[in-house]
Amino acid sequence: METSKSSTMQVSFVCQRCSQPLKLDTSFKILDKVTMQELTAPLVTTAAVKPGDIQEVDSNIEETFAENRTDGVSRRLIPPARMMSTESATSFTLIGEASDGGTMENLSRRLKVTGDLFDIMSGQTDVDHPLCEECTDTLLDQLDTQLNITENECQNYKRCLEILERMNEDDKEKLEAKLKELAEDEERLIQELEEVERNRELVAKDIEKVREEAERLEQEEARYQKEYSEFKRQQLELDDDLKSVENQMRYAQIQLDKLKKTNVFNATFHIWHSGQFGTINNFRLGRLPSVPVEWNEINAAWGQTVLLLHALANKMGLQFQRYRLVPFGNHSYLESLTDKSKELPLYCSGGLRFFWDNKFDHAMVAFLDCVQQFKEEVEKGDTGFCLPYRMDVDKGKIEDTGGSGGSYSIKTQFNSEEQWTKALKFMLTNLKWGLAWVSSQFYNK
């Protein structure tokens, strides 16, 4: 039973360098008083050890070990010799039953002695104990290196001492004469140094005056430099402003020249074609069964067309008869001059109402009438002017005079989408010719 109790006791020391747990050698269990005196003796003895010192060490070893018998756990801390705090970096814990008083007391005493031994060893050297085997080997290597260095120094001192001992009396006299000569040189050099020091003081005063003058000049230079920098900054700002104004004028002149060469009508109204569709500003005018163009796009194209004819008429000073063009985006319309309340919409939303309401057809025929009036007005001043497609306002048709010779209705009722789309394409082509004539008459000049 006692053996099992003893086997439960655990002691743990840690290495003071790497903090790894240590397993102590069995020789620590049989330390006697003579061995303790040998281990704790100083490495270099400068005086005889008094008997009282041995008794003091022995009394430290016999210091009472603190044990808590209520929980069977005894604790002891081993502080390093160079630690200012009373807490230790080395500690161990005894775990066992307090009922076995003799075994616990002997073990506690041995551990206390071991801990005190480590404290004493740490105090005798510059190394904290205990150490593990690897750290001990490293320490031994360092000590060997220091020992070799010390031995080399000792050999050098011995050689110097031997050289001094071999010197004879003549050498001593020569050295004394040399020493006297050096003393005279020293006295002479001291006098020269004093003279140089006096000259240095005079030069220092001159330097101080020159330094004051230099400071004054530096202040004036700094003030002039500051003023120069300010004027330079203002000059750079004015140069930047001047360059900016010149660049703005140059850019404005370039834009002015470009605008002078720009035809407003050509830049604003781009008439072209996309397949079978005539387009104005990329809006398709017309519909096909295979390409059902949205009515919003068709209405927008009509709005651009009305705006173009309205602008051309204003440029020529033309007043249309019977109708007045009202450009209003994708809701543009014509206003009857004979009946002010009658509006002819040039927009449509499709559906069943589109097939029964003929206002949209009347509006397109009225617009064709306005195009015809524009053509006649141009022909008054230029008899050589001719549109590529002849327009029959009474029938609401446009004839392909230069091609198949057929005529195409501009109305949607009782008409196919293909013919209606082709009629609109021919109408846009006539407007493109009218646009080119107005541009040549009013802008190229």
UniProtKB/Swiss-Prot annotation:
Keywords: Antiviral defense, Autophagy, Cell cycle, Cell division, Coiled coil, Cytoplasm, Cytoplasmic vesicle, Endoplasmic reticulum, Endosome, Golgi apparatus, Membrane, Mitochondrion. Residues 137-264 form a coiled coil. Gene3D superfamilies: 6.10.250.3110, Autophagy protein 6/Beclin 1. It is a peripheral membrane protein. The keyword Mitochondrion applies. InterPro entries: Atg6/Beclin, Atg6/Beclin_C_sf, Atg6/beclin_CC, Atg6_BARA, BH3_dom. Plays a central role in autophagy. Acts as core subunit of different PI3K complex forms that mediate formation of phosphatidylinositol 3-phosphate and are believed to play a role in multiple membrane trafficking pathways: PI3KC3-C1 is involved in initiation of autophagosomes and PI3KC3-C2 in maturation of autophagosomes and endocytosis. Involved in regulation of degradative endocytic trafficking and required for the abscission step in cytokinesis, probably in the context of PI3KC3-C2. Essential for the formation of PI3KC3-C2 but not PI3KC3-C1 PI3K complex forms. Belongs to the beclin family. This is Beclin-1. It comes from Xenopus laevis (African clawed frog). The lineage of its organism: Eukaryota, Metazoa, Chordata, Craniata, Vertebrata.
